Amino acid sequence: EPEPKPDPEYPVTVGNVTLTEAPTAVVSLSPATTEMVYDLGYGELLVGVSEYCTAPAAAVAKPRMGSAYQPEVEKIKASGATLVLCTVQPTESTLTELQQAGAQVLVLPRADSVEGIKQNYRALGGLLAGNVTGTAAAETVSTAIDSKLAEATAALSRMAAVPDATLLISYPYRMATGDTLEGQLLAQVGFHCSGADYTNWLYPESELRALEPDVIFCAEADEVETVKQSYEYKVVAAVKNDKVMAIDFTAFQNQSLRMFDTLAEMAKFTAAEPAEA
């Protein structure tokens, strides 16, 4: 009898999770891992999502199974899931309960670079679809990421001067700073990040006079009008030229393909000629 050929797809090991075959039922307890599963093309494997999942639309219809901090273990057990995904470490007791129910738990922490995001997709793709197929799916995502970054860079490269961008998490001074991935992405595609010289999402009030954004991106849509009328911002070019845009910040929080789509939209919005009055 000839030896059976080894399966090129499995086993796959990522961290402390080893799968010997493709999972048929997966639960995602973080909005980020949910989006990533769909980005890779394996949304149909999800039998449950977190109560905080809002994207993509298809995920919203899936059964809700709590969150990484408070999973509904009975629902997860009943779903038959063999793999549970999240971005934060569940408690020891939760981990034990899930493992006893036959599910392995993959914690995929937030990345601090584009390469780290791509690695997260590779890890996830491998587990979901195998060493060959899953890695190929992750490469497709990587290519899409690169093309969106190129699109953003191309839009801004047509501008006469490097635009100064404020990515405002909450009015007035909580914004992307130089130490954040968001701040680094702004710089990578050709913005000057307003908070580049500062850290930890905080611009110093004492430096207000130096805050001169050409464009402002508001993570809170309802802050757009506040910003436009505010003492801090009403005098800056961004407001005078109507370059204030609301963005869906969950795209950045989730580090999904949507983040790079959003970045390209931000660049195009900035580079667009102002409408003729």
What are the functions of these language-model segments?
Residues E1-T34, A78, N131-T166, L211-V215, ...:
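Bacterial Sec-exported substrate-binding components of ABC uptake systems
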Residues T24-P90, D197:
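A short, structured surface patch at a secondary-structure boundary
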Residues S30, V88-Q89, R110, Y171, ...:
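Short secondary-structure boundary segments
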Residues E51-A55, M175-Y203:
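Alpha-helical, coiled-coil/dimerization segments enriched in small aliphatic residues
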Residues P71, E115-G126, C218-A277:
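Structured C-terminal subdomain patch of bacterial secreted/periplasmic proteins
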Residues V73-G80, T96-A101, Y203-V215:
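Short helices/loops that flank or line small-molecule/ion binding pockets
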Residues P90-Q100, A210, V215-K234:
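A ligand-binding cleft/hinge motif common to bilobed small-molecule-binding domains
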Residues S93, L106-G125, P163-G183:
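Extracytoplasmic ligand-binding site segments that recognize negatively charged/polar headgroups
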